UniProtKB/Swiss-Prot annotation:
One matching Pfam family: Metalloenzyme
Function description: Catalyzes the interconversion of 2-phosphoglycerate and 3-phosphoglycerate.
The protein's name in its UniProt record: 2,3-bisphosphoglycerate-independent phosphoglycerate mutase
Gene Ontology MF, one: manganese ion binding
Gene it is expressed from: gpmI
Family, similarity comment: Belongs to the BPG-independent phosphoglycerate mutase family.
Length: 501
């Protein structure tokens, strides 16, 4: 091993695009960045489709990006795995056991999930396939719909409602029970008041009632509320859950499923509570959630974090709340426990309704803490995530996103200044694009989703003369190991992108 240490700085949602129109990054004031891309070796990384273990053409996301970054290999993602296996769902032993308990208890089945073709947290066809299988067992099914508007256009929910209604129109035992914007039903930031609002509608039918989901959605549109933020409401004569019922979550991404599931199974209590013990998920969401899953996860070994730990080196993971799981759980390939000599720091995200109201988020606090830890000269590897470009980009507010980019630029400048004269090498990249495309010209509305654009890959303050090849996210870990002069394990099929001059 050499005396080099590495800081991997992940600029979440920072993509490259030659088109400056509606590009918050290109239009922002960022003198440090502009100088950095001229001064240091740079290339680009692919973040979508087959190159990250997703279906061809599927937009990448933060979970997928961090799994690939940390694993050093293309990891087959849950979306692909479920697409391959759901055709056999009627024979799935976990689902059959779930159904058996419902029938024994004379309960109904509650099925909930994000009704979206975004492919980030869910895929609507998975829900439809499971509904078909459940309906064949002659049990009553209540569907709880989470509305997207973030990985899909902000005003598109009625399209997906109509797809569902067309699919179930001949199924007399299936009814839409509630709808809720994902802002409430899929919070991950411990803003439990949001989760409780969704839970009360689902568990007790305690929300405004509509005869038709499309009417509820249109009412929200008329009030200027887009899909993501639609208040939970009850549909038709739905009257709530009972303890003998079953609950199935069709989201396959864990971070935004955890809070609502913990409320359903009673791990997070409310003033009034109904606990559904017969609960099942698509995947293993967390070691702290003890429920079965339809599609068990594969174990990923010899990730970057594990290799660092095996060499008895110290490492640090740091991010604000919104991205903390990404630099820990996801970066470690789905492992919740820390490795030996792995420190973790979570900086609270600001308590605001949406992050366009505070574009700087907690980047300054993250930066100050990182600088304190750099000065300790303790860590061989520091992994940090800046959430701003992604989280503010998701609001669709280009002016706020430009402010977020400027705030990030100031943070990068502080870190670069801090490592001058040290053995730290700063590796800058992103997990996917977002902030470089802020408007959907085709639909004439703000663009709030991720992009298919490549992301930057820059190496700063390295003592050797190099150039960088273009690559994929899975090539980042092998590149870092080369800088650290650590042999790449055989499980890592990515390659180092360094070419020595």
């Amino acid at each position: 091993m050499t005396n080099h240490s590495v800081i991997l700085c992940i600029l979440d949602g920072w993509g490259n695009s030659e088109n400056s129109q509606f590009n918050a990054i290109a239009q922002s004031y960022k003198p440090c960045w502009d100088n950095t891309i001229l001064q240091y070796p740079k290339s680009q990384l692919i973040t979508h489709g087959l190159n990250v273990g997703l279906p061809d053409g599927q937009i990448g996301n933060s979970e997928v990006g961090h799994v690939n970054l940390g694993s050093g290999r293309i990891v087959l993602q849950d979306l692909c795995k479920i697409n391959n296996e759901i055709k056999y769902i009627k024979n799935n032993r976990y689902l059959l056991e779930f159904i058996k308990k419902i029938k024994q208890n004379n309960g109904i089945c509650h099925i909930a999930g994000l009704l979206s073709d975004g492919g980030v947290h869910s895929l609507h066809t998975h829900m439809l396939d499971i509904i078909d299988t459940l309906s064949n067992f002659q049990i009553q099914i209540a569907v709880h719909i989470f509305l997207d508007g973030r990985d899909t256009p902000p005003i598109s929910a009625i399209k997906y409602i109509n797809i569902l209604r067309e699919h179930i129109k001949h199924l007399n035992n299936v009814n839409i029970a509630t709808i809720s914007g994902r802002y409430y039903s899929m919070d991950r930031d411990n803003k439990l008041d949001r989760t409780r609002t969704a839970y009360k509608a689902m568990a007790f039918a305690d929300a405004k009632r509509y005869t038709d989901p499309s009417l509820a959605i249109q009412d929200s549109y008329n009030a200027g509320i887009t899909d993501e933020f639609i208040l939970p409401c009850v549909i038709g004569d739905y009257n709530g859950m009972n303890p003998q019922d079953g609950f199935i979550m069709t989201n396959f991404r864990s971070d935004r499923a955890i809070q609502i599931i913990k409320m359903i199974i009673g791990d997070i209590k409310t003033d009034n509570h109904i606990t559904l013990e017969n609960t099942i998920g698509m995947v293993k969401y967390s070691e702290s959630i003890n429920i079965p899953c339809l599609f068990p996860n594969n174990n990923i070994t010899n990730t970057l974090g594990e290799v660092i730990a095996n060499h008895k080196l110290h490492q640090l993971r740091i991010a604000e709340t919104e991205k903390y799981a990404h630099v820990t759980f996801f970066f470690n390939g789905g492992r919740e426990d820390t490795f030996e000599n792995e420190d973790r720091i979570i900086i609270p995200s600001p308590s605001v309704t949406t992050y366009n109201l505070m574009p700087e988020m907690s980047a300054k606090e993250v930066t100050n803490t990182v600088i304190e830890r750099i000065k300790l000269q303790k860590y061989s590897l520091i992994i940090l995530n800046y959430a701003n470009a992604d989280m503010v980009g998701h609001t669709g507010n280009i002016e706020a996103t430009k402010q977020a980019i400027t705030a990030l630029d100031q943070c990068l400048n502080k870190i670069l200044n801090c490592i001058q004269g040290t053995n730290y090498v700063l590796v800058i990249t992103a997990d996917h694009g977002n902030a470089e495309e802020m408007f959907d010209v085709k639909n004439n509305m703000p663009y709030t989703a991720h992009t298919l654009n490549p992301v930057p890959f820059i190496i700063c303050n390295y003592s050797k003369q190099i150039r960088l090849k273009n690559g994929r996210l899975c090539d980042v870990a092998p590149t870092i190991l080369e800088i650290l002069n650590i042999e790449k394990p055989k499980e890592m099929t990515g390659i180092s992108l360094i070419e020595y001059i």
